[in-house]
A protein has these predicted regions:
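Short nucleic-acid-contacting surface segments enriched for D/E, G, S/T with interspersed K/R
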Residues: 96-116
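Short, charged beta-turn/beta-strand-edge "cap" motif at the junction between a beta-strand
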Residues: 106-107, 116-136
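GIY-YIG-like beta-to-alpha core
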Residues: 86-99
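OB-fold ssDNA-binding interfaces and closely related basic DNA-contact patches used
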Residues: 1-83, 124, 132-136
Length: 136
């Protein structure tokens, strides 16, 4: 930690902005650490997909002084029913995910389901892909 004008500045910090439910202290610590999470952006290719049975999610606000470009960014962590963590910074993925998650939680809270995560070519940016998900 660096000090400046007698205040402590953190070079790296993670704050939980929101979560799908109230978290215990242990869960708060565990979910803020996404270093051991499966990175959706890196583990999906244009040719395959991944199935996740979501149980919870956490939205994290990250500050990283050493980041190239934007030092403040958001990470979305999805926790599956087996306790595995998946992380992405993709707004398009999380927008679709939260629509599915909230609808299922409200209209069918006891129904088990999975989401299929996949990459799609961007229509707006040639040669670029984005990740999204669908209910299966």
């Amino acid at each position: 930690m660096a000090t400046k004008n007698n205040t402590v500045e953190k070079e790296y910090s993670v704050i939980i902005r929101n979560s799908s439910r109230e978290l215990s202290a242990k869960e708060k610590i565990a979910f803020r650490d996404f270093g051991n999470a499966i990175k959706l952006d890196e583990n999906l290719s244009d040719d395959d997909s991944m199935l996740i049975a979501p149980a919870d999610y956490v939205i994290l606000d990250v500050h990283n002084e050493k980041a190239k470009g934007n030092k403040d960014y958001t990470k979305y962590v999805i926790i599956d029913t087996a306790g595995n963590k998946y992380v992405t910074g993709s707004e398009s993925f999380f927008t679709r995910f939260i629509e599915i998650f909230e609808t299922m939680a409200e209209d069918a809270p006891d129904e088990e389901y999975q989401i299929e995560c996949y990459k799609k070519p961007s229509k707006n940016y040639a040669g670029k892909s984005f990740i999204s998900c669908s209910l299966v």
